[in-house]
Each structure stands twice: as C-alpha cells, then as structure tokens.
Amino acid sequence: MMLKRKYGNRADWKRVIKRKYAQTYLDNGEYKGYITLLNTIKVTEPLSVRYGEKSVCIVDDGYMWLQQFPNNKNHSVTTMFDAGGNIVQWYIDICLCNGIDNDIPWMDDLFLDIVLLPTGEIIEKDADELEDALLKGIIDKPLYDLVWNEVKTLKGLIRKGSFDLIKWSHSHKGILSNRLK
C-alpha cells in the first residue's frame, strides 16, 4: 500500500526560498504528540486556493504553518497564519497514522481532507481521490470506512466547538515561535 508520507518540516517545498522551522514533543496532560512550526520568510510567489467563490491566500512572505501530529490519532491539523498572525484556515488531513523518522514528524495521508475557515465554514476536499484510491486498490474497504468515520467524528466535534486541536493553535504556535531557527 503506497500512501503519501508528508513531513512536518516540508523540506522539499520549492516555493519557500527562505524559512525558519521549529518542532517539539508535547505531553502536557491535554495534548500528546509532536508540533511543528514553519515560518515562510520568503516565497517565490504567493499561493491561493479557491473554495467556490472564495479565494484564500494560504502562503506568502511571513506566513506560518503550525502542524499538530497527535499520538494515536487518524488526523493531523495544519493551522495557516498570515503575516499578521491571523488564522486563514485550518487544514485537517485524515491519515493512517502519525510518526517520526530521523527526528522529523510525519503522517501517512489518507486522501480526504477537511478545511475549516475562520467563518466556521467546513469544506470536504479530495473525496474523488479517496474513491479513486479504493477503486485502484491503494486502500481497502476497512481503511475507506475508517476515513469516512473519522471525517464524520471530526465534523461533529467542530460543529459542537469541541475539537481541541483548533483551540490550541495559538498556544502551540506560541510555544514554538521563540524557537524558530
């Protein structure tokens, strides 16, 4: 089974020409897992994504991406901050697992993603990629079902205001901001 492994330091991201990065392992009673922070000091060009009529700039000079890799969970959250420190979106990857390799946190991506905008709007992304992966035998039916169950659970938590990872975006960013190198 070939899933795409995504690393927290995003070392292969060509768009980012000057960067700072920090990571740490947290175990504070509330959260257990790695957190990473990438500061895109200089980029070749800004990157915007479209959601219907909306265009959201997710990376530009001075942006920060906080990624949370909670232990024993089937998701990882990337909070994207603009240069003023405002959250532009939360990007929730559904994943097989989170891990660490050569001291860099990673997650094995399971195709389907949830985007949460500061307005509260929830967008499901890449359902077609998930269907395709099932048809091609990249994932099996139990894994396919795990993804949809995870999405349903997370959307329920978000709607109730009890998905804690998004509440901790600012505090987790604060922990790493002064460690950026």
Residue ranges and their predicted role:
Residues 52-101:
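The feature represents the first ordered module of a protein
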Residues 129-153:
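Short, surface-exposed, low-complexity cationic segments
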Residues 84-137:
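Conserved, surface-exposed functional patches that form binding/active-site neighborhoods
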Residues 1-64:
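Charge-rich, low-complexity N-terminal segments
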Residues 90, 142-144, 175-181:
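A short, hydrophobic/aromatic-rich structural module that often spans a beta strand
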Residues 150-181:
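Cysteine/selenocysteine-centered motifs that mediate thiol-based redox chemistry or coordinate metal-sulfur cofactors
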